[in-house]
Structures are given as structure tokens and as C-alpha cells.
């Protein structure tokens, strides 16, 4: 995640901009020059036009900061009437989270097939944990497979 608009990666939407930040320190970036650091309670999303009949892969690298950081990645399909369906989830629990910089864990999930009536696909990422916990995400990708 290289380009930011204030604290939020460019092209992404946040539930609260104050819960996001650009991470650039040693051990905080998987590749490139920066990553996004999400505080507990942060919800970040990005919506794309759907390709009906296809599958989508959501992948990302994550590193936890604090005692109980966790993250959930989700692929959501939305149809022309505005109805949403959860197409895939990947949850990284605190006990499974890599918490030792400069190491990152790699996580991915593949969606169900996109139905013909689906018009958009949304990537949704949510950081959870204690008040002082956060998750650093890098190389977030949604690809047609």
C-alpha cells in the first residue's frame, strides 16, 4: 500500500480515518515503502465492478502489534437490487497472528463463483483486539482467478 490520502490508502474507504495510519518504519513493511496500520475497530473497504461467472482471491500480508490483535478479510457480493452476500471470509485470530517484526503472515481466501446478478465485489478488512492493539497490512490484493 504505497499511496495514501492523509491516513488512508488511496482508493480505500474507512469507517474512521483516525483508526488508520501509514506504516513506514523498519520491520513494518512487507514490500515497497509503506503499509497500512489499522487500530482495533478499524474497518477498511474497497468496491470493484464484478465479473459474473468468476472467482475472486483476496490475499494480504499481516503483522500484529500488541497483545490481542486480529483481522478479518471478507469478500462481499452486491446485486443490482442492493442485496449483499458474504462470498468468503478469512479470520486471523490473535493466537495465530505473526507479532514479531519484521515477519509477516500471508493469508488468502477464494470466493464462491460470482452469480450473474451481482454487479459489485467489495473487499472488507476489519482489525479487532484491545485498545492498544493494531494490525499492519501490506500487499492487499483482490484478483480474478
Question: Where do the language-model regions lie?
Answer:
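Extra-cytoplasmic beta-strand recognition segments
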Residues: 1-4, 40-75, 107-112, 140
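Extracellular glycan-recognition surfaces and repeat-rich motifs
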Residues: 2-35
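Extracellular beta-rich ligand/substrate-recognition surface
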Residues: 33-43, 98-101
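A short, structured loop/turn motif at beta-sheet edges
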Residues: 51-53, 79-82, 113-117, 144-145
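Extracellular recognition modules
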Residues: 59, 122-126
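Extracellular ligand-binding interfaces
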Residues: 62-97
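Extracellular carbohydrate recognition and processing domains
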Residues: 84-118
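Extracellular carbohydrate recognition
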Residues: 103, 127-144
Amino acid at each position: 500500500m504505497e499511496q495514501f490520502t492523509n491516513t488512508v490508502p488511496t482508493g480505500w474507504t474507512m469507517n474512521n480515518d483516525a483508526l488508520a495510519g501509514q506504516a513506514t518504519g523498519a520491520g513494518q513493511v512487507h514490500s515497497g515503502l509503506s503499509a497500512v496500520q489499522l487500530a482495533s475497530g478499524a474497518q477498511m473497504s474497497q468496491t470493484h465492478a464484478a465479473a459474473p461467472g468468476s472467482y475472486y482471491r483476496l490475499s494480504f500480508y499481516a503483522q500484529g502489534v500488541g497483545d490481542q490483535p486480529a483481522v478479518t478479510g471478507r469478500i462481499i457480493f452486491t446485486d443490482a437490487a442492493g442485496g449483499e452476500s458474504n462470498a468468503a471470509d478469512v479470520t486471523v485470530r490473535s493466537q495465530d497472528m505473526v507479532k514479531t517484526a519484521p515477519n509477516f503472515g500471508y493469508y488468502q481466501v477464494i470466493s464462491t463463483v460470482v452469480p450473474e446478478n451481482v454487479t459489485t465485489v467489495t473487499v472488507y478488512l476489519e482489525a479487532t483486539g484491545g485498545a492498544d492493539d493494531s494490525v499492519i497490512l501490506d500487499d492487499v490484493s483482490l484478483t480474478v482467478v
